[in-house]
Amino acid sequence: MTAAVDGVTDWEQAIPLLRQAIEPYDTVGPDYRDQSMDARRPSRTKAIEELPVALGFVLVSEGDVRRAVLGGTNYGRDADSIASMAGAIAGALSGLSGVPADWAADIAAASKTDLVEPGRVMASVALDIRAADAERWATRVAALDALV
């Protein structure tokens, strides 16, 4: 995917390039409404296109949430999955300041969902896990040092 969109920063220009890059590995086939027999089956040589294409839009958009989502939305095929993954990844990389405020406000109001607190909770859990891992590692290092 990286090579397919190297130097491309326009999501519209990236759409045919990403489609061409994933096509040899795609289980669905060229006609999304008339899927091939192997569609969506686990394979060592094929891939479900959504995640690779979403990552492609994150690259093309340079991590910009709005551009990543617009690219994914306009890609077609499983656009809702591609756009939501691209937006989630770009948003996670950039943090709250990278998410368009107007989008966040509209989505929070329409879904009646607090979009900020779950992120704070997940960040807190990640910090707790990191601290516990660091403590376990320090215990391991001390035990190894005691052997030498």
Label each PLM-derived region with a short phrase.
Residues 1-2, 113, 148:
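Generic structural signal for short, solvent-exposed loop/turn connectors between secondary structure elements
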Residues 1-76:
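Accessory "access/gating" subregions that flank catalytic or transport cores
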Residues 3-4, 89, 140-144:
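A glycine-rich phosphate-binding loop feature that marks nucleotide/adenosyl-phosphate handling sites
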